[in-house]
């Protein structure tokens, strides 16, 4: 039956595409109503089919059992109640200041129940502002509880703690069963088809863009309209897990890959994941830490201050007074990696959202492996401790302590760090921003060529700058991986050749690394070498490189179509995460308009690399 469901999703997509092709002319002549009726009928059939499958959970589990057997996901899937938990919109917690007295009372009462036992966690500190790497827009409305907290904070000389969860985030139960998650993707497939029809209708009824504006790589399909992007965001924020992780990866791409309007919407994916109801959250904690986990804490805030793809983060205070951040994994996420990735790739493939040359099968395998590692919080704790040891004497970076007694397979607790994420660093002086970026790039080179052990997630919120100590805390080590010497030996020579302006060297080393086969077209070879040379310009410049003024994005954009269409083999598996980290580090430098000397930095890394090896380059 699960196979029938997937066939249904694909069939609906093909139906939508066929209607688009055959009825475009009728749209121009006023046939919009006919199109809407066709779409509504398709949606009705889909919803009826999904309802027929409601009682068939076992067959779906059998369908995906063979996929699970290929991966070592030892945590058992939890049996949570199937009744849907009522969603709690942000407006029901943070009321508008102009609401009536009766409504005010009822909402304040609900909020009081939600935060029962809450104490201001920052009242013991003075003159200290903490940020929680989420959407930082203000929240309207003041309750009696807010006023009381403000008074207490004023008496203690500190600012009150403020929830930084995005206003768009809603309290919604995580779909735990595979059938429940599949139904959400089925609804998304239908919605995308309807949205595509509507987009074609709008485009056919308005004049074409004559401004000659360049389209982004993922901006060529009616399935990727703004309305459909909204549908994607809503679904990803609800199901979370592997699907949401891909949306977060899209959110950190620049405008050359994603239309700026779509990028803004996908940015919400990074900041606006829904969060678990209290009942589901506490059950997850009790399952992992035992029923008496609260006895180890003086305070635990039941509303999370951050919600991401795999888990949500809560503020707590231990009995010894230390403030900690408790990351709780969403139930069922680890067990649903295979089905989530398959379902999402089906939706993206049918909507033509994946450009040619991405090698989806290879990409799927890489995503599965990375997500399986990120769901293992015991492994992440080990990675954090290893990085803490590697950077123990670093004057600028540090790693917060892991709290072992409150950590497990699905719960990771670390000390809470002060400061703010780098996306709020734009107001700092340019000299300070240059120093931050220089340290980030230097750390990136050390991770790859000295440690051969890299945290590969370049999310802004994984770098917290504390202006009081002038240090940066490094967070989130779930995406940490190692690199073999056989890989770094060749990769460092590719960068060296690019920095030296040696095109033949770039080509030779690229073939050795299996970026190219040696049988590509001349156009493909030139595009690949050009891209590497462009990326190596920062390490070639004798003068400080101006990341804010560089045209790297535009020039790489012009090469992407050729590389996607004429690539013969997928790139090395290691480069997916490596280039995500390096590209993200360059993007941070660009956003902060950094102007730093990188040539000396790379030459020092190159010299140290080979001096620490038994053999020299090309030996």
UniProtKB/Swiss-Prot annotation:
Membrane topology: Single-pass membrane protein
Primary localisation category: mitochondrion
Compartments reported by the entry: Mitochondrion membrane
Residue positions binding ATP: 309, 327, 414-417, 462, 476
Top enzyme category: transferase
Activity regulation: Autoinhibited by the N-terminal domain, containing the KxGQ motif, that completely occludes the typical substrate binding pocket. Nucleotide-binding relieves inhibition.
InterPro entries in the record: ABC1_dom, ADCK3_dom, Atypical_kinase_ADCK, Kinase-like_dom_sf
Chain ranges for the short sequence motif AAAS motif as given in the UniProt record: 306-309
Cellular component, GO, one term: mitochondrial membrane
EC number(s) per entry: 2.7.-.-
Span(s) of short sequence motif KxGQ motif: 245-248
Active site residues according to the UniProt entry: 457
Pathway: Cofactor biosynthesis; ubiquinone biosynthesis
SUPFAM superfamilies in the cross-refs: Protein kinase-like (PK-like)
Domain Protein kinase per the UniProt entry, residue ranges: 298-487
Single GO MF annotation: ADP binding
Transmembrane segments: 182-198
Stretch list, region Disordered: 151-171
Keywords: ATP-binding, Kinase, Membrane, Mitochondrion, Nucleotide-binding, Transferase, Transit peptide, Transmembrane, Transmembrane helix, Ubiquinone biosynthesis
PANTHER family: ATYPICAL KINASE COQ8A, MITOCHONDRIAL, PTHR43851
Subunit record text: Homodimer; homodimerizes via its transmembrane region. Interacts with the multi-subunit COQ enzyme complex.
UniProt note: domains: Adopts an atypical protein kinase-like fold: while it adopts a core fold similar to that of well-characterized protein kinase-like domains. The KxGQ motif completely occludes the typical substrate binding pocket. Nucleotide-binding opens the substrate binding pocket and flips the active site from inside the hydrophobic core into a catalytically competent, solvent-exposed posture.
UniProt function note: Atypical kinase involved in the biosynthesis of coenzyme Q, also named ubiquinone, an essential lipid-soluble electron transporter for aerobic cellular respiration. Its substrate specificity is still unclear: may act as a protein kinase that mediates phosphorylation of COQ3. According to other reports, acts as a small molecule kinase, possibly a lipid kinase that phosphorylates a prenyl lipid in the ubiquinone biosynthesis pathway, as suggested by its ability to bind coenzyme Q lipid intermediates. However, the small molecule kinase activity was not confirmed by another publication.
Identification of the protein by name: Atypical kinase COQ8A, mitochondrial
Species, as recorded: Danio rerio (Zebrafish)
Originating gene: coq8a
